[in-house]
């Protein structure tokens, strides 16, 4: 099933999330690591500051495993909406936004 996901980034864990997305930690997670990485690469930051992306998931509870292992640690106010497939979202690329946050903290 495909979902549109909206959430607020937890700024205090942004650097950790970026590191795990780029060093293979999340990618190696089974069964959904690659989909999480791909989803974060599709994600955007909307004008309101919300992070928005689309993702495929086959858990009984939408994004159940993804939330337990990654998302609930790094995002708050996460909501899902069933959609027909991957969606295009308007906004700034999320990964570039993470890079900016990390650069400001160095």
What are these regions (language model features)?
Residues 24-29, 73-82:
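A common structural junction motif
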Residues 36, 76-90:
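Conserved short beta-strand edge segments in small beta-sheet-based binding/regulatory domains
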Residues 1-68, 89-106:
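Short S/T/G/P-rich N-terminal loop/turn motif that feeds into the first structured element of a domain
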